A protein has these predicted regions:
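Polyanion-engaging groove/track-forming segments
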Residues: 1-641, 651, 655, 663, ...
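RecB-family 4Fe-4S metal-dependent nuclease core
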Residues: 567-920
């Protein structure tokens, strides 16, 4: 075998594929790692490929036991206690560097420096530790010792190596490699030092401002080389994604150099564990439900489909784990999977793990529980994946991950668990997936050019190497040297790497480097090898050719201007017909039709809705649902046990009962508040909620008001409305039906909001349409003549405040109606005007037109024109005829109909309607 050995040749080409020169059998080009493997094979010293995370785990276990008996103030006890995984990884890396330099884990002695004594103590106990295996450093040390033994003993051994050509000087190598190559020469291997190549014949620098500017220039230059049938090699030490886009655009294959990233599936592991940990992270659970596995272009949800779809609905109703909606979702999913026992078992197992056996981070996770939970995830990946798919690969990695976690003791901190998972799934560096090319080759490091001769195109020669770090203290270095361990100098290693790169570049004779001033907004540092190449020319009195990175005219192309049709957010024309009209509406639909009919049309007639995972309640919506349910459950219990003959009940303000119900429903309806970092918010919310709910019951009891029902469903006819089949049916749920002290039926609408004046203003301004809807339904049920005869009120569960115009509620302040521009003097007038406004919208839909006045009044240009600031005269954003029409429509909506203008700012689909978006 003929070996060409260079310090940076690991990964270099054995032959130069960009030339016509063919390689020969038994000729290889190697660096230190590859030569170590060859020698280990020839000397029968090969070891199975080691698993780095398992080695770290084994080292961590032994180090932990050693430090348990150490002085608690000694190095590195405190660091290990705070971050055991990182400390173990760093010490193992240091241990491997020592071993590769010849250290044999000498028995600790009194004169040994403390840090080395710790390493020696650990080294003695590694043999037999589960998960421990020798690493590359151990193999290198054994190769060094074995070759030295063969030299000393005079024994013959068939190495099968005839000659080694060293790209550099033997004296410059690290001590261990000087010994190894010297031993090989003593054993009969010819050793030759290759001569240093001469400086370059030509160096061209093409400079650009940014990578975006350099990409089309580089693509054009490479295209010119191909057109001229010139063989070349591209060096790309960073991603070529932008360059590849330009190459594909002009019809050339991509170079395929990309940053290595962990599989998106690997990111599911920490996501899954967060979702499985109580208190449950609902956002993590939503992410898990949104995760799919793609194999052979077929996408399957990670969580079984029948359960996934139902859990999405359950979480929209109750954003927590284990409540009634969750129970119903699991039961329905199992029923739907009755003919698929495998799917049913996965559903049962998932429900059991997350609801009945959740993980708990109580001073760390129980490692056995973590491994048990990961088994379900492993089965999902392996059952969905096939062959060499990414899915099956992730599944196969989970098995050793479970084994490793089990080796880390009984408990593991959440931080260390994340580190372990990252160690298994993380990647680094860059990878090349270039297509076959008879003229071009791609490498990621200048040294990988090896001994080839084709000219070079260097894409972004920037210095991104870390500065060499020496972790050995002077007293430790002195002790190691005295005991025969010659540590390599980090700076000397860096010089060897640079020299290897320079030799490979100089052999190519012709180099074109595409440089940029900034990368990712920061100044780009020039690669040191390029600096030396320029200095080579300077010493010869020459200069590199410097060109501006302007794209050649023949490679320039400008995009054709595209005309964008800006959607009209206010007025649209449609195919007229009854198909656009509803037959039944709720209050929310009614209000939407009045303020944003275009959005109602998108949602109710075109079926456009936000995805279920995007609408999981949070914030005030989540808390409001939780408190509503607390009130509902307490009322229903008392109705079942204590109702009067007329089916109503007076509920005492029992703080213990309220607090207990709040706590019981918390994980089902507001799991988000149980997460770390929310304790202050949770405490404040619990206190406010308890006080407000107790205040509600106290206020009603003091006024002699009894509760008749909560969440009472109703259906009534919207008399005089122009629906698809005549009068519309109006339906919904009333929050709380009450019987006043004088026997009159009334309604309370429960709210939870930080806007203290929102509903108070609605009552005073005569715009409380929701209360009017409730009043109409009660009046219909009890044959009351006027809506104003029905006492109605808002109760804010956050502020413990009742907003009403009816003094019979006993509120501290009874409000009076002072109609605003769009309000009504009483409930009956508001109802009639709202019906008039609704009919105007419905008649427009029937005729095939829709005018969204809500989108009109939220436009800044319209606001500036309609209500100009003092001293200004802005123009209308519309032509004169359109402005007149919109002004008339607004006047009619505000005075004759009902236009809930304050709610216009709340939009669901502004980008679709054109109310928002940059169309410039």
């Amino acid at each position: 075998m003929h070996i060409t050995f260079g310090w940076g040749f690991d990964g270099a080409r054995w032959v130069d594929p960009a030339t016509t020169t063919s390689g020969s059998l038994g000729t290889v080009t190697t660096g230190p790692h590859q030569l170590t493997d060859i020698l280990a094979t020839r000397l029968a010293l090969s070891a199975p490929e080691c698993d780095a995370p398992m080695r770290i785990a084994a080292y961590r276990s032994v180090l932990g036991r050693v430090l348990e008996t150490s002085d608690q103030h000694a190095w590195p006890v405190a660091s290990f206690r705070a971050d055991p995984w990182t400390v173990a990884r760093e010490l193992l890396s240091w241990r491997d560097r020592l071993v590769s330099a010849g250290w044999d884990g000498t028995v600790p002695t009194a004169d040994m420096p403390h840090r080395l004594r710790v390493l020696s103590t650990v080294e003695k106990r590694l043999d037999g530790e589960p998960g421990w295996s020798p690493g590359p450093a151990d193999v290198l040390r054994q190769v060094d010792l074995t070759l030295a033994h063969l030299v000393d003993s005079g024994d013959s051994w068939p190495l099968g190596i005839d000659r080694i050509d060293l790209d550099g000087q033997l004296a410059d190598l690290s001590p261990v490699w000087t010994r190894i190559l010297g031993s090989l020469r003593s054993l009969g291997v010819e050793l030759h030092e290759l001569p240093a190549p001469a400086p370059l014949d030509a160096l061209t620098l093409i400079t650009s401002d940014t990578v975006w500017d350099a990409a089309p220039v580089a693509a054009g230059h490479l295209a010119d080389l191909r057109d001229a049938s010139t063989r070349h090699t591209v060096i790309a030490g960073t991603s070529t994604s932008l360059l590849d886009r330009e190459r594909v655009r002009i019809g050339h294959p991509p170079l395929g150099v990309a940053s290595r990233q962990a599989s998106s599936y690997a990111q599911v592991i920490p996501l899954y564990l967060r979702a499985m940990t109580a208190p449950h992270d609902i956002h993590a659970l939503v992410g898990l439900l949104n995760t799919s596995i793609t194999v052979d272009e077929k996408t399957t949800p990670l969580v079984p489909g029948p359960l996934r779809s139902r859990l999405i609905g359950a979480l929209n109703e109750q954003p927590g784990v284990g409540g009634p909606a969750w129970d119903a979702a699991v039961s329905d999913a199992l029923a739907a999977s009755a003919d698929h026992p495998g799917t049913a078992q996965k559903i049962t197992d998932f429900d059991t793990l997350i609801r009945h056996r959740p993980l708990s981070d109580d001073n760390g996770f129980d490692t056995a529980d973590v491994a048990f939970h990961l088994e379900w995830l492993q089965r999902q990946f392996t059952s969905q994946g096939r062959g060499q798919s990414v899915s099956s690969d992730v599944g196969s990695r989970i098995a050793p991950l479970r084994e490793l976690i089990s080796l880390l003791g009984e408990r593991i901190s959440s931080r260390e668990l994340d580190q372990v998972i990252a160690e298994f799934t993380g990647t680094g560096g860059i990878s090349v997936q270039a297509g076959a090319d008879d003229l071009a080759d791609v490498v990621t490091d200048p040294a990988h050019l090896g001994t080839g001769s084709a000219q070079v195109v260097w894409w972004l020669p920037v210095d991104d190497a870390a500065a060499p770090r020496d972790t050995v203290r002077p007293d430790e270095l002195e002790w190691l040297t005295a005991n025969g361990v010659d540590l390599p100098d980090p700076e000397a290693d860096a010089r060897l790497t640079l020299d290897s790169q320079l030799r490979a570049l100089r052999r190519r004779r012709n180099v074109t480097a595409l440089t940029v001033d900034t990368i990712n907004g920061e100044s780009a540092s020039q690669h040191p090898a390029l600096t030396f190449l320029i200095d080579d020319l300077h010493r010869q009195g020459r200069e590199p050719v410097t060109l501006s990175g302007d794209l050649p005219e023949e490679h320039r192309s400008l995009p054709v201007p595209v005309s964008i049709d800006v959607p009209d957010p206010v007025s649209r024309s449609l195919t007229p017909g009854e198909h656009l009209l509803p037959t039944r509406i709720s209050f929310s639909q009614w209000e939407k039709l009045l303020v944003h009919p275009l959005e109602w049309l998108l949602e109710r007639r075109l079926g456009i809705r936000a995805g279920g995972l995007a609408t999981i309640p949070s914030g005030n919506q989540m808390i409001g649902t939780w408190l509503h349910t607390v009130v509902e459950n307490i009322v229903n219990r008392h109705l079942d046990a204590d109702a009067d003959t007329d089916g109503a009940v007076t509920i005492p303000a029992d703080h213990d009962e309220i607090a207990a119900e709040l706590r019981r429903l918390l994980p089902w309806y507001a799991a988000e508040l149980q997460m770390p970092g929310h304790s202050r918010e949770l405490g404040a919310t619990l206190a406010l909620a308890e006080q407000s709910i107790a205040g509600l019951f106290t206020t009603l009891a003091d006024a002699g008001i009894r509760i008749r029902a909560v969440e009472a469903s109703f259906t009534t006819t919207l008399a005089g409305s122009h629906g698809a089949e005549g009068d519309l049916e109006l339906g919904g749920l009333r929050d709380m039906d009450v019987i006043m002290a004088d026997g009159t039926p009334g309604v309370i609408d429960l709210k939870y909001t930080f806007a203290r004046k929102k509903y108070r203003d609605a009552v005073q301004d005569g715009t409380a349409l929701q209360l009017a809807v409730y009043a109409a339904s009660v009046a219909d049920e009890h044959s009351l003549r006027h809506l104003a005869d029905v006492p109605v009120a808002y109760f804010n569960l956050r502020d413990n405040r009742l907003d009403t115009t009816d003094e019979r509620f006993g509120a501290p302040e009874t409000l009076s109606v002072d109609p605003s521009e769009t309000g009504a003097s009483d409930t009956d007038e508001l109802w009639n005007r709202a019906v008039t406004g609704l009919n105007h919208i419905l008649d427009g839909l029937r005729a095939g037109r829709v005018t969204d006045l809500g989108n009109l009044v939220i436009q800044e240009d319209w606001q500036a024109w309609e209500k100009p600031k003092k001293g200004t005269s802005p123009a209308s954003p519309y032509d004169e005829d359109t402005t007149t029409r919109y002004t008339d429509d607004l006047r009619e909506a505000r005075t004759t109909g009902f236009f809930p203008e304050k709610n216009a700012v709340y939009t669901d689909y502004p980008l679709i309607t054109g109310a928002q978006g940059d169309f410039s």
